[in-house]
């Protein structure tokens, strides 16, 4: 995982020395498409994503739920992220860059801004007409996809309904800080103190979610919402990846009946299932983080995957 500095690629891991061993995620820089007047146009936008990344996964889920596969084209990165960051080099599940012809994701960023400085991440929502990055913040891209294409043929369904927004926002805030990002804060910590600061709140949140789901089918109200969509990619990767690779090993999701049920329900959803590729995700995490797993060995297990999943999912 490197970064661009004034448009020049640098292969550099995260700096944790200046933060006491803590992993600090930088904010996304492209935040367009959120104004009230924004309307989607079929064929105008292109998504850069990948099966490994949980942030991209939530966007792939929303794209599928809204039936936008024909309206928003996609490129999918290689599982392996090495000295050049994310790539479109040939490999399993890769969909080449048909828009900018990039071999490396950083070339998409420099196509938008030759002097860009910052991390090079997915997902990216690219505007083909203006030849620029519209947005690279996953939480905002899913909001765009949720409603911006409703008047041009998207499937019905509002996953951020007005009546539930305060509750969705409340759950999202805790889940992001302690769980979605918490697994990274645990896994990329370089001091014991920083690791434990992330570790214990993570499991407090899992315990809280398990209790919250008692007698409930979904996190908010009686329907699938954005809160479930944002939680699911972390849960689906947890036992096979985060439990071992990121040292989040107090409990498994399999030890939480209600959370396991939620995973099974979404993993078996006809539109969500094709977005899951656990084999690809395992290959990425275990093979692309030499500071965490120097040998690059990919574990075979778990022996009993979560409901709706297989080791080849």
Curated annotation (Swiss-Prot):
Chain residues that bind glutathione: 86, 119-122, 137-138
Keyword Iron-sulfur listed: no
Catalytic residues, chain numbering: 53, 184
EC category name: oxidoreductase
Gene3D superfamilies: 1.20.1050.10, Glutaredoxin
Signal peptide stretch: none
Gene null: resulting phenotype: Disruption mutant does not have GS-hydroquinone lyase activity, is more sensitive to PCP toxicity and has a significantly decreased PCP degradation rate.
A Pfam family the protein falls into: GST_N_2
Taxonomy, superkingdom: Bacteria
GO molecular function, one term: oxidoreductase activity
Any single Gene Ontology cellular-component annotation: cytoplasm
InterPro entries per UniProt: Glutathione-S-Trfase_C-like, Glutathione-S-Trfase_C_sf, Glutathione_S-Trfase_N, GST_Omega-like_C, GST_Omega/GSH, Thioredoxin-like_sf
Catalytic reactions on record: 2-(glutathione-S-yl)-hydroquinone + glutathione = hydroquinone + glutathione disulfide
UniProt keyword annotations, A-Z: Oxidoreductase
Residues annotated as domain GST C-terminal: 161-285
Enzyme Commission numbers on file: 1.8.5.7
Function: Catalyzes glutathione (GSH)-dependent reduction of glutathionyl-hydroquinones (GS-HQs) to the corresponding hydroquinones. Can act on halogenated substrates such as GS-2,6-dichloro-p-hydroquinone (GS-DiCH) and GS-trichloro-p-hydroquinone (GS-TriCH). Involved in the degradation of pentachlorophenol (PCP), a toxic pollutant.
Complex formation: Homodimer.
Family: Belongs to the GST superfamily. Xi-class GSH transferase family.
Protein name, UniProt field: Glutathionyl-hydroquinone reductase PcpF
Lineage, top ranks: Bacteria, Pseudomonadati, Pseudomonadota, Alphaproteobacteria, Sphingomonadales
């Amino acid at each position: 995982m490197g970064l661009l500095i004034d448009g020049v690629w640098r292969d550099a891991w995260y700096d944790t020395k200046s933060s006491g061993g803590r992993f600090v995620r930088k904010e996304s820089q492209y935040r367009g498409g959120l104004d009230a007047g924004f309307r989607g146009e079929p064929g105008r936008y292109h998504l850069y994503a990948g099966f490994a990344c949980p942030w991209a996964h939530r966007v792939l889920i929303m794209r599928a739920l809204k039936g936008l596969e024909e309206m928003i084209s996609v490129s999918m990165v290689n599982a392996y992220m090495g000295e050049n960051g994310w790539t479109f080099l040939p490999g399993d599940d890769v969909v080449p860059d048909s828009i900018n012809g990039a071999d490396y994701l950083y070339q998409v960023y420099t196509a938008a801004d030759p002097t860009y400085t910052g991390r090079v991440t997915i997902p990216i929502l690219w505007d083909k007409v203006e030849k620029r990055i519209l947005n690279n913040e996953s939480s905002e891209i899913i909001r765009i996809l949720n409603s911006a294409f409703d008047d041009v043929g998207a499937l019905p369904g509002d996953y951020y309904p007005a009546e539930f927004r305060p509750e969705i926002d409340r759950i999202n805030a805790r889940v992001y800080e302690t769980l979605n990002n918490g697994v990274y804060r645990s896994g990329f910590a370089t001091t014991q103190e920083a690791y434990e600061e992330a570790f214990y709140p993570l499991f407090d949140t899992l315990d809280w979610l398990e209790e919250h789901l008692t007698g409930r089918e979904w996190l908010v109200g009686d329907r699938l919402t954005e809160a479930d969509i944002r939680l699911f990619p972390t849960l689906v990767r947890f036992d096979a990846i985060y439990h071992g690779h990121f040292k989040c090993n107090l409990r498994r999701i399999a030890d939480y009946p209600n959370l396991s049920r939620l995973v099974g329900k979404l993993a078996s959803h006809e539109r969500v299932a094709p977005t899951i590729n656990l084999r690809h995700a395992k290959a990425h995490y275990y093979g692309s983080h030499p500071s965490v797993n120097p040998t690059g060995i990919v574990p075979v297990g778990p022996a009993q995957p979560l409901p709706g999943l297989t080791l080849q999912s």
